[in-house]
UniProtKB/Swiss-Prot annotation:
It is found in: Plastid, Chloroplast. Part of the 30S ribosomal subunit. This is Small ribosomal subunit protein uS12cz/uS12cy. Gene3D superfamilies: Nucleic acid-binding proteins (2.40.50.140). It comes from Gossypium barbadense. The keyword RNA-binding applies. One of its GO terms (cellular component) is chloroplast. GO terms for molecular function: rRNA binding; structural constituent of ribosome.
Length: 123
């Protein structure tokens, strides 16, 4: 426990929380344009070809965003909406593309967990 004299000399420091998605700049989502769409392989125990896109945001930042779901129509110059959220087995991928908005269509034939993949309720 510090003395009052010590606190006067050196005030208590505020603990600042560090954001995990800094390029969004405090916004829940950001719009961006795909500059490259490609696949990468995950970290060690896992094996796959994960679909990712390099996106230039309206704020000027260039980020790598994951394309969730099976099948996608994203290509170069597609306008997409990006949200925060990392992919644990892809180093450097800290963002997700939001399906079902702008140029990213929803996942075809999706029945469960539809809201996460931008799919309307089937009739």
């Amino acid at each position: 426990m510090p003395t009052i004299k010590q606190l006067i000399r050196n005030a208590r420091q505020l603990i600042r929380n560090v954001t995990k998605s800094p390029t969004l700049g405090g916004c829940p989502q950001r719009r961006g344009t795909c500059t490259r769409v490609y696949t990468i392989t995950p970290k060690k125990p896992n094996s796959a070809l994960r679909k990712v896109a390099r996106v230039r945001l309206t704020s000027g930042f260039e980020i790598t965003a994951y394309i969730p779901g099976i099948g996608h129509n994203s290509q170069e110059h597609s306008v997409v909406l990006v949200r925060g959220g990392r992919v644990k087995d892809l180093p450097g991928v800290r963002y997700h593309i939001v399906r079902g908005t702008l140029d990213a269509v929803g996942v075809k034939d999706r029945q469960q967990g539809r809201s996460k993949y931008g799919v309307k309720k089937p009739k």
